[in-house]
Each structure stands twice: as structure tokens, then as C-alpha cells.
Amino acid sequence: MDITLSIPDWIARELSHYPEFLLTHEDRMRMIIHFSKLNSEYGTGGPFAAGVFEQNTGKLISVGVNIVVPSNCSSAHAEIMALSIAQKKLEMFDLGSPGIPSHELVVNWRPCAMCYGAVLWSGVRSLVIAGSGKELE
């Protein structure tokens, strides 16, 4: 049996409005927060989004959103989606491999225990978090 998870179609459309490089953490976070809001507005998942960027250049590698409910998959959190897409795109499971740029994960909310574990295993060098608290737990 195969397992296939797909991000919503609107993401590609929205990404076309953004530059390839987002130079500041503020710009990266602004984009991720925008995607988290759109995910709720479009009804394609919960209010969570994440992005993988090259740490020093701000090059956007991937964006993921929460698709737990539409995919019937409890592990389809935004962080997992963003990391998985980046790993497939770069054709490597270790985003901290020698010889490649350092990567960071930008998230709109504090990761859960599962996602935090995935962050550690992914090899990203930095985790940038917009907020935390009971409001979205």
C-alpha cells in the first residue's frame, strides 16, 4: 500500500506571488503566517504553516500546511509536510548534510512533540517560531 499526501493546489498559485529569496526572518514569517491563514480560509486544514529556507540566503525551498483532516492522516502537520517536501526536492533526507547550505524551518506556532522530533531528525540548523500558547493547541 502506498501513502500519498498532497498539499492544496492553491499553494502553488500563492507561491507565484513571492520572490525566490526572502531575506529577513520577518519576511519569511510574514509569508508563513499568510499561508496559515489561507489554509483556514480555504478550508484545506488547520491554521498552521511552515517553510524550509536556506538559512543564510533566504532561498525558499518548500512550504507545507496542516492537512490532517482532509488527508485523514494525523501526522500531516505543516512542519512534517514542509520538511518532507524539502527532502524530496533536494533528494536528501538530511537537510544538514555536509556540502549543502544550512537550512531553517520557519513555523507560525510552536511545534508539537511529533514535529519537534522531526525537526531534530531533519538536520535543519535553525527553528524560527512565531508564537505559542493555548490559543491554537
Language-model segments: residues:
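Short beta-strand scaffold segments in enzyme catalytic cores
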Residues: 47-54
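Zinc-dependent deaminase
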Residues: 1-41, 101, 111, 117-137
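Short, glycine-anchored, charge-dense loop/turn motifs used at functional sites
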Residues: 55-61
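Conserved hydrophobic/aromatic pocket- or pore-lining residues that grip, position, or stack substrates
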Residues: 32, 49, 82
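Zn2+-dependent cytidine deaminase-like catalytic core
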Residues: 62-137
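Surface-exposed helix-capping loop/turn segments at secondary-structure junctions
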Residues: 41-44, 93
